[in-house]
Amino acid sequence: MALGKRLKKAREGVDRTKLYPLADAIKMIKERATSKFDETIEVAINLGVDPRHADQMVRGVVMLPNGTGRTLRVGVFARGAKAEEAKAAGADVVGAEDLVEKVQNGNIDFDRCIATPDMMPLVGRLGKVLGPRGMMPNPKIGTVTMDVTGAVKGAKGGSVEFRVEKAGIIQAGVGKASFTEDKLVENIKALADAVVKAKPAGAKGTYVQRVAVSSTMGPGVKVEPGTVLA
């Protein structure tokens, strides 16, 4: 079936002017995730912030109770004992100057990046490469740390980094279409709770303004914010 026809069919029965309770929205999304692959379930949260102002930036990391259903490749910048610790914890790529050089040459063979504090003077050179990809290690989200084992296992076990985009939206994958409705609801509520806890001091008015869920190939379904935050 052509993509256009599939999406048109998937949109049938979805009232794009209506706000659905979260559980109903998830059910609708799962019913319409009919691709041959296991589609990712995504959530978009519109916030009442302007991230161009430093005091309205929203970012953080949350451990989803049911994981993401995705296996991340984790890269760690570390030396000596910490490098060995990273390997033992299951990191896919570990290095120091050698790994910095690879990344500078465009060879980024990982999805999540962790660094020990002593490596940051070196890793700082990679800002132009890792920054636009949202992969720059940051102590605020636990990716610059001496607890290499915890960071690697967290990344492998279902932690999700979130960051508000220019339009004031946070987007994140929260599981797969094969997950049960209950597990997806739990994951979305965990993400929403973390976003609320990360509310910046400069935020004014209604913080969580709109919420929508979708699958990789399916339509978006608008959600009643109150059912996500409850």
From Swiss-Prot:
Chain coiled-coil ranges: none
Gene3D superfamilies in the record: 3.30.190.20, 3.40.50.790
Family annotation (InterPro entries): Ribosom_uL1_bac-type (IPR005878), Ribosomal_uL1 (IPR002143), Ribosomal_uL1-like (IPR023674), Ribosomal_uL1/biogenesis (IPR028364), Ribosomal_uL1_3-a/b-sand (IPR016095), Ribosomal_uL1_CS (IPR023673)
SUPFAM superfamilies, per the entry: Ribosomal protein L1 (SSF56808)
Gene Ontology molecular function: any one: tRNA binding
UniProt GO cellular component terms: cytosolic large ribosomal subunit
Keywords (A to Z) from UniProt: Repressor, Ribonucleoprotein, Ribosomal protein, RNA-binding, rRNA-binding, Translation regulation, tRNA-binding
CDD domains, alphabetized: Ribosomal_L1
GO BP, sorted A to Z: regulation of translation; translation
Family in the record: Belongs to the universal ribosomal protein uL1 family.
Function: Binds directly to 23S rRNA. The L1 stalk is quite mobile in the ribosome, and is involved in E site tRNA release. Protein L1 is also a translational repressor protein, it controls the translation of the L11 operon by binding to its mRNA.
Oligomer and partners: Part of the 50S ribosomal subunit.
PANTHER family named among the record's database cross-references: 54S RIBOSOMAL PROTEIN L1, MITOCHONDRIAL, LARGE RIBOSOMAL SUBUNIT PROTEIN UL1M
Protein name per Swiss-Prot or TrEMBL: Large ribosomal subunit protein uL1
Source organism of the structure: Bradyrhizobium sp. (strain ORS 278)
Name of the encoding gene: rplA
